[in-house]
Design a protein with these regions (language model features):
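Phosphate/nucleotide-donor binding subsite
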Residues: 1-27
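Short, acidic/small-residue loops that bind anionic groups at enzyme active sites
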Residues: 32-35, 44-74, 82-84, 151-157
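Short glycine/serine/threonine-rich phosphate/pyrophosphate-binding segments
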Residues: 39-47, 68-69, 134-139, 162-163
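Glycine-rich phosphate/diphosphate-binding loop of Rossmann-like nucleotide-binding domains
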Residues: 121-163, 167
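Well-ordered alpha-helical segments embedded in enzymatic catalytic cores
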Residues: 12, 16-20, 102-106, 164
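Cap/lid and interdomain-hinge subdomains that line or gate substrate/regulatory clefts
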Residues: 2-5, 69-133
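Short acidic, glycine-rich surface-loop motifs adjacent to enzyme active sites
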Residues: 27-41, 132
Length: 168
């Protein structure tokens, strides 16, 4: 890897992790995935996590999970649970040990209670978007659709919701 740029190395590692996680998931060898790191490790881990289905347990402990960073590039249209590390990763200390223990407890609980989303079913599905001033109308329209036998999935139009709806 010494002959390639840092961004190429990060992309290569992300592709390798995507392949590995996908294979482990398909062969039912993992019940969840947890990652930790700064910006580069966050990019590598979450690129692979985003390839796993909605509902599959995913936790990322990251130095960039809070603050002013725009987080769409990390989470995308996925359901990755992000936990701010608060301190940088420079060994285990009184702060990092508590944060990491909490993250491990979270992924273990998620894996134990894992329920993947079943997209097959007897009723038809309608998707809608909601945001602020449209809420009352969407709630009313949703009830009318439910009364006619539809399941209504309402997505917030910004953030992961809107992007997920567009990707369906």
């Amino acid at each position: 890897l010494s002959d390639i740029s840092k961004s190429e190395a990060i992309n290569t590692m992300a592709q390798g992790l995507k392949h590995t996680l996908k294979m482990l998931y398909q062969n039912e060898k993992i019940d969840g995935v947890i990652g930790m790191g700064g910006l580069q490790n966050t990019e590598i881990c979450t690129a692979a996590m985003r390839e796993l289905p909605l509902g599959f347990p995913k936790v990322m402990v990251s130095t960039v999970a809070s603050g002013r960073r725009y987080f769409a590039s990390v989470v995308g249209k996925s359901d990755i649970v992000t936990i701010p590390s608060i301190v940088d990763f420079n060994g285990i200390n009184r702060v990092s040990s508590v944060i990491l223990s909490s993250a491990v407890a979270a992924i273990c609980a998620m894996a134990k209670e894992k329920q993947e989303i079943c997209w097959a079913g007897p009723c038809k599905v309608i998707a809608s978007t909601m945001m602020g001033v449209t809420n009352d109308t969407v709630v009313l329209a949703s009830q009318l659709m439910k009364d006619k036998g539809f399941e209504v999935l309402s997505f917030h139009s910004t953030g992961a919701g809107g992007a997920t709806l567009e990707g369906m």
